Design a protein with these regions (language model features):
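Structural boundary micro-motifs
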Residues: 1-67
Length: 67
């Protein structure tokens, strides 16, 4: 899915998302105004998405599946 779709999915569905460039087991999930990664680290949403903009970051997002 696109970056915009991933952002909307994370907020509306509440399930973790990942980018195809993330390592196995890496994901973020929406927690209100912040994102939380797989280790519980709080990531400010605005900063997270600003860093991951343009180029390959605009596509390649998916729902995280730990299988």
């Amino acid at each position: 899915m696109t970056k915009q779709e991933a952002m909307a999915f994370a907020i509306s569905v509440g399930k973790p998302i990942r980018h195809n460039s993330f390592s196995k087991g890496e994901f973020v999930r929406d927690e209100g105004k912040e994102l939380v990664d797989e280790e519980g680290t709080i990531l400010p949403q605005q900063e997270f998405w600003a860093i991951r903009s343009g180029g390959s970051w605009e596509n390649g997002w998916e729902e995280y599946n730990d299988n």
